[in-house]
C-alpha cells in the first residue's frame, strides 16, 4: 500500500516533494498511515479535492479529477499530455525571425524582432493530439467516466467481477463487471482497456477475457507490474 510506496521512494533517495491528490480527508488518512514511515527524506504535499470536477494544471500536462459512483467518495482521473503544433518555418522566414529565436517561440515565449512583437501563435500550427490516460476504480458505470475516458490512449478500469451472475452484487457494492467496463471502453472509443481491481474471489481473471473481447477487442486482463509505452501519433 501507500506506506510501502513511500518507504521505497525514501530508500531510493528521493528528495523532491511528492504531491498526493485525493478526496477531502486525504491528509488525515495518509498521516495516520505514516506511523510505519515517520521519517522520509522528502516533503509530502496534499491536494484535497472538493469539487465534483476539478482540473489540476502542471507544466506540459493536466489531470482532470471527476467524482464517480461508489459507497464512499471516490474519484476517477484522466491525465492529458499536451502537445504543441508544428513550428511553421515558412511563416518564421516570412516574418524575418532570426533562427536563434525560433526555440523561444517553440517554448511558448513571446519575442521582439526589430521593434515588432512576435507571439507563438504567429508561427505555430494548431495543437496536435497529445496522450491521454484515464484511470477509474471503485464505481458503477457513469456518464462522466465515459465522457472523461473519451479517446484515451489507455483506459485503466476496474473489472471486479467476470461472472454474469455477479451483476446484482456489482450493483449492490457499487462496482463494475468486466463486461460493463468493456462497454464503457467501446462507447468512449479508447485505444486499449486494461482491467484491474479484481474481486479476491476472482482467482483467474484471464478466464473471462475472450468473452469480454467480444464487446471490446483491445482488452487486457492486467496484473501488477504491467507496463507499456505510449507514443505520439506523429
Question: Where are these predicted regions, by residue range?
Answer:
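A glycine-rich helix N-cap at a beta->alpha junction
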Residues: 36-49, 218
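Active-site-proximal loop->helix
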Residues: 29-35
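Short internal beta-strands
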Residues: 16-24, 156, 194-195
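Conserved phosphate-binding/catalytic loops in two-lobed NTP-binding clefts
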Residues: 217-227
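Catalytic metal-binding/acid-base residues of hydrolase active sites
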Residues: 25, 140, 160, 199, ...
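Phosphate- and divalent-cation-binding pockets in alpha/beta enzyme and binding domains
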Residues: 1, 28-29, 144, 204
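Di-metal (Zn2+ and/or Mg2+/Mn2+) metal-binding site signature of metallo-dependent hydrolases
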Residues: 1-12
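Metal-dependent phosphodiesterase/nuclease catalytic metal-binding core
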Residues: 52-195, 204-211, 215, 231-234
Amino acid at each position: 500500500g501507500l506506506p510501502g510506496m513511500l518507504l521505497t521512494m525514501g530508500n531510493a533517495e528521493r528528495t523532491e516533494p511528492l504531491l498526493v491528490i485525493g478526496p477531502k480527508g486525504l491528509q488525515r488518512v495518509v498521516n495516520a498511515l505514516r506511523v510505519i514511515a515517520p521519517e522520509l527524506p522528502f516533503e509530502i504535499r496534499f491536494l484535497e479535492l472538493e469539487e465534483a470536477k476539478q482540473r489540476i494544471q502542471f507544466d506540459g500536462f493536466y489531470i482532470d479529477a471527476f467524482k464517480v459512483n461508489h459507497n464512499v467518495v471516490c474519484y476517477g482521473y484522466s491525465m492529458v499530455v499536451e502537445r504543441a503544433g508544428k513550428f511553421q518555418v515558412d511563416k518564421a522566414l516570412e516574418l524575418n525571425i532570426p533562427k536563434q529565436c525560433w526555440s523561444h517561440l517553440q517554448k511558448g515565449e513571446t519575442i521582439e524582432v526589430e521593434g515588432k512583437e512576435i507571439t507563438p501563435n504567429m508561427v505555430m500550427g494548431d495543437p496536435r493530439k497529445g496522450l491521454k490516460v484515464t484511470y477509474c476504480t471503485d464505481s458503477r458505470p457513469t456518464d462522466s467516466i465515459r465522457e472523461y475516458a473519451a479517446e484515451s490512449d489507455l483506459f485503466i478500469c476496474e473489472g471486479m467481477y467476470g461472472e454474469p451472475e455477479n451483476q446484482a452484487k456489482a450493483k449492490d457494492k457499487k462496482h463494475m463487471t468486466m463486461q460493463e467496463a468493456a462497454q464503457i471502453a467501446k462507447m468512449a472509443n479508447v485505444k486499449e482497456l486494461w482491467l484491474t481491481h479484481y474481486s479476491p474471489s476472482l482467482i483467474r481473471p484471464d478466464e473471462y477475457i475472450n468473452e469480454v473481447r467480444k464487446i471490446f477487442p483491445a482488452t487486457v486482463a492486467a496484473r501488477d507490474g504491467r507496463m507499456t509505452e505510449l507514443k505520439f501519433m506523429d
